[in-house]
Amino acid sequence: MDSIETHAKQLGQQTPLPASPEAAQLDRVPNPHADTDYLARFTAPEFTSLCPVTGQPDFATLVIDYVPDRWLVESKSLKLYLGAFRNHGAFHEDCTVGIGRRLVALLEPRWLRIGGYWYPRGGIPIDVFWQTGEPLKSVWLPDQGVAPYRGRG
């Protein structure tokens, strides 16, 4: 099996926030349990990007669930990649689906889903959901745990 050091290039050193999501380096590490179906979850409760029209900040909670195959995403590189959206202008749907697709291209997981729970803009919350196909029946798939947005009342 490949060593972690050859794949986790940013781990253990000071790494600046990438200038853009495209410039961000996502790292992967070998999955020591590639023979086992299990779910890994990442939750980013303070995700930010910019509206591509107004430049105003948009805020979301992202929940990424995946069933790994040979590769795991290295969490520091994922944190830096998601942080690179802070000054990136894109619509909610583009951010959410684009993140999911980039992870699928990197990891080639057995299954992946992403939920983007966006705070209201113009009084309308936008939730975006994307997945690669049917979830595996052998894996416990908990609810993403993000309550529907409720205004006052």
Curated annotation (Swiss-Prot):
GO cellular component, one term: cytoplasm
Catalytic activity: 7-aminomethyl-7-carbaguanine + 2 NADP(+) = 7-cyano-7-deazaguanine + 2 NADPH + 3 H(+)
Gene3D superfamilies, alphabetized: 3.30.1130.10
GO MF assignments: preQ1 synthase activity
Matching Pfam families: QueF
Pathway: tRNA modification; tRNA-queuosine biosynthesis
InterPro entries associated with the record: GTP-CH-I_C/QueF, NADPH_dep_7-cyano-7-deazaG_red, QueF, QueF_type1
Stretches of the chain forming a coiled coil according to its record: none
Places the protein is found: Cytoplasm
Residues where substrate binds: V73, E74, S75, H92, E93
One Gene Ontology biological process: tRNA modification
Domain of life assignment: Bacteria
Region Disordered, residue ranges: 1-30
Key word Oxidoreductase present: yes
Coarse class of the protein's main subcellular location: cytoplasm
Keywords attached to this entry: Cytoplasm, NADP, Oxidoreductase, Queuosine biosynthesis
Residue positions of the active site: C51, D58
This enzyme's EC code(s): 1.7.1.13
Purpose: Catalyzes the NADPH-dependent reduction of 7-cyano-7-deazaguanine (preQ0) to 7-aminomethyl-7-deazaguanine (preQ1).
Family: Belongs to the GTP cyclohydrolase I family. QueF type 1 subfamily.
Name of the protein in question: NADPH-dependent 7-cyano-7-deazaguanine reductase
Provenance organism: Methylorubrum extorquens (strain PA1) (Methylobacterium extorquens)
Gene name of the record: queF
